[in-house]
């Protein structure tokens, strides 16, 4: 009977990021997934360029923008249309190049076209039974199949906030954003009536892709219940039409829906998670790729060390893995971000615009560190305190839950 060191569930970015690091560790590894790891990834992945530069991976960007802005005014006059300039480069990852780079590093790892039905701990090992009837034994199972994992256990939480987005890559009757411009957040509400302004806020995320092609996406940062794709599509078209812009050709439609505030998994369990299954989505932004790339190497190195101890069971290996993935520092940071997200979800569009306008008055290092989850805990506490002190009264009251 073959006993793997590690069996990975999934074949998306999280699975391949970790597998590409584990492949360096001289371990017996396989993966299983309903999709081939070679199947093209459809979603677009944006990232602050510095996150890839720090890892020497900036060549994976298909586009890079220096003109990065947001709009937090009311859109009613010149002042309300004034952009907030970020002066920080943003990039779009070339999905094909990113996927191929990871697959190249995963050479030697076989992926089986299987789906796990049940995972049991048996004689200190993990026995995975697939829907086909195939049984696979491994010392450790890592679920990197996404946030809908059936095997990673976490505290029950009824109200899970979701980030939802509907987007279009296409051509338009006139440019939806300026030439060579990237818009992180356009919260201007002047295309909405008073009743619509009372509903859960959303913003435009948009970029010039060149050759008269643009990506525009209506995004709800976090909402419970989630905004529907139909609602977001209507909002996007209304936003465009209010500027006299019509869609002339669609190359790709994007639909996004994922949880922003999943509780952290229990650390004492015999399955380890990674990516969405491990609650690694950043509650402040919804981003995860940078975190996957930064956190995979250490986890892979530590797991290789733990696996050298033959007496360790699946439960012990996974528990040690969870401690590496979610140490005290990262856990406390996550709690702070989740608190902030809960407060933002209670803000109407006016208060939310005021919050973000104030947020981007932080120094570049502070707001970038906040959005990329790279600030050490003491610095994060300092930045959040500074942000609160400098906030307008209505934002302070909202953060304190007093209004």
Protein language model annotation of sequence segments:
Residues 9, 143-144, 273-275:
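Redox-cofactor binding/interface segments in oxidoreductases and associated redox assembly factors
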Residues 14, 37, 148:
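Conserved Rossmann-like nucleotide-cofactor binding loop
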């Amino acid at each position: 009977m073959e006993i793997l060191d590690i069996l990975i569930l999934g074949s998306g970015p999280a699975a391949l990021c970790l597998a590409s690091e584990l492949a360096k560790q001289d371990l017996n590894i396989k993966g299983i997934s309903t999709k081939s790891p070679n199947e093209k990834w459809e979603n677009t992945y944006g990232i602050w360029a510095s996150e890839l530069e720090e890892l020497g991976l900036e060549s994976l960007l298909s586009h890079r923008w220096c003109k990065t802005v947001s709009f937090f005014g009311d859109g009613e006059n010149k002042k309300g249309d004034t952009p907030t300039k970020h002066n920080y480069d943003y990039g779009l990852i070339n999905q094909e190049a990113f996927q191929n780079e990871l697959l190249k590093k995963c050479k030697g790892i076989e992926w089986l076209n299987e789906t796990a039905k049940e995972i049991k701990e048996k004689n200190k090992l993990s026995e995975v039974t697939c829907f086909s009837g195939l049984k696979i034994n491994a010392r450790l199972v890592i679920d990197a199949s996404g946030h809908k994992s059936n095997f990673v256990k976490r505290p029950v939480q009824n109200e899970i906030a979701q980030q939802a987005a509907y987007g279009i890559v296409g051509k338009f009757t006139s440019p939806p954003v300026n030439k060579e411009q990237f818009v992180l957040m356009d919260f201007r509400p002047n295309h909405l009536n008073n009743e619509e302004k009372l509903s859960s806020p959303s913003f435009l995320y948009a970029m010039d892709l060149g050759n008269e092609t643009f990506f525009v996406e209506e995004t709800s940062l976090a909402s419970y219940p989630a905004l529907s794709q139909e609602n977001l599509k209507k909002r996007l078209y209304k936003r465009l039409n209010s500027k006299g812009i019509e869609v002339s050709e669609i190359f790709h439609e994007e639909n996004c829906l994922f949880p922003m505030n999943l509780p952290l998994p229990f650390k004492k369990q015999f399955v380890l998670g990674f990516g969405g299954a491990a609650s690694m989505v950043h509650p402040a932004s919804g981003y995860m790729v940078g975190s996957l790339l930064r956190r995979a190497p250490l986890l892979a190195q530590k797991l290789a060390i733990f696996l050298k101890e033959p007496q360790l069971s699946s439960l012990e290996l996974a528990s040690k893995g969870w401690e590496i993935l979610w140490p005290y520092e990262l856990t406390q940071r996550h709690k702070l971000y989740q608190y902030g997200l809960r407060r933002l979800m209670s803000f109407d569009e006016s208060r939310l615009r005021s919050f973000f306008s104030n947020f981007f008055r932080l120094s570049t290092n502070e707001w970038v560190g906040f959005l990329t989850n790279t600030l050490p805990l003491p610095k994060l506490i300092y930045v959040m305190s500074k942000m609160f002190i400098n906030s307008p009264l209505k934002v302070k009251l909202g953060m304190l839950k007093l209004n």
